[in-house]
Amino acid sequence: GKAKPMIVVMTNGNAWQDAAAGESPKGFVAPSMRPDERAKVAEGAFELSFPEIVKFVEKNFRTLANKKNRAIAGLSMGSFHSCNISKYYPDMFDYVGLFSGASTGNDKSTCPVYTDFEGKLKTQFAKKPALYFIACGKTDFVYKGVADFRKLLDDNGYKYEYLETGEGHIWRNWRIYLTEFAPKLFK
């Protein structure tokens, strides 16, 4: 195949939902996008606990346990998480994929994951990630945020790859992004 063999771990980064869409302690309900339920995302618990996920995988599976053999990627909110996790733990992942999303910091949060956004980004890029890949559709509702993030990277001379496709925040785009990203890993 085009991509190297790899272990893929898919976490539930949707911190205010206990399970897959439609499954929760509340019974079979549609996922909520209520701001009061999303508020806990700003506490950074998911990002702060991420090393535990890495430790679990490395303890239970045959892995190459080092930065050059780890990647993190996500779509939509997962892109937000991947951006923040990779900059908060700059020695953990050498490959970063942001599909339809990014982050530009959160001035209101006191969580260490979100504070000093630009300083942490500077540290991450000083360590020269092997690949920092960003992709977004032209009509995606997060397009402006991604453009702002890319401007920040450009203004600081940070190296990244960018792929722009048509359409918006849809699975068709995310499949394209993964198809482009995966073969670039671990080279």
Predicted region positions:
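Non-catalytic cap/lid and distal C-terminal segments of serine-dependent acyl enzymes
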Residues: G1-K187
